[in-house]
Amino acid sequence: MRRLFLLFLFVLTLFGAQAQPKWGTWSVVPHVGVSFANLTNDAIHTTDERISHSQTRIGFSGGADVCYQLTDKLALSGGVAYTQAGCNFKDIPADLNAKHGTVFHNAYFNLGYVDVPLLAHIYISKDLALSIGCQPSFLTKATSHTEMQDYETDGKGGIKYDKNEVSEGDVKHWYKKTAFAIPVGISYEYENVMLTARYNFGLSNVYGHDLGDSKNRIITVSVGYKFNL
């Protein structure tokens, strides 16, 4: 995820300059995009002591920001956005050296948050800005999905699978209602079109009731349009 974010930063720095925003002005920027989310230190542990670690889950992100150009080099913004988060888990295949076991596949946590990013934007050129701030997020949904199959091996490379079982449901009670993050990002503006990338560095444990210690790690890439007021 960090490599993707750094590549995006590099591409944006290659673009040319546009008109500098005027200080003392307001604007509204609705935006839509995609999220690349993961949960730190999260994993599924099987009965045969194998581990499926979390990996990136791709989802939707969209919302709107209200911006105030404080000076030629500094702008402030507040916004509301909906972001899909959570994580996928790596499939656990059959172990042909074992007499029996369970395979896990298509496992994921699907989380939804309403984010309230509060940001300062520092212009490093006429059209390119770096941003940093704070962000509370409010959990709106949390579901889990796992598919599993028991199996037996014959010791000769053959394997017999039982029926595929699907386990899914609402797990919102596992998670805290509020999460906090530090968003850092970069934005490029061309003819009022805004291209933005943000990395949300989660500060708080998303789980409640001592279920684990995982934090959100989310990259959002979005395109928006700047309406000057």
Which sequence ranges carry the predicted segments?
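Bacterial Sec-dependent N-terminal signal peptides
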Residues: 1-31, 223-229
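Short glycine/proline- and aromatic-enriched beta-strand/turn motifs that initiate or cap beta-hairpins
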Residues: 20-67
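Outer-membrane beta-barrel channels and translocator barrels
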Residues: 21-23, 69-71, 125, 191-193, ...
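Hydrophobic core residues within well-ordered beta-strands of beta-rich domains
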Residues: 26, 60, 74, 114, ...
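Residues on the lipid-exposed face of transmembrane beta-strands in outer-membrane beta-barrel proteins
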Residues: 30-34, 60-68, 80-82, 116-124, ...
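Extracellular/periplasm-exposed beta-strand and loop segments of Gram-negative cell-envelope proteins
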Residues: 38-57, 84-112, 139-179, 183, ...
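N-terminal non-globular leader segments, chiefly Sec-dependent signal peptides
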Residues: 60, 72, 97, 102, ...
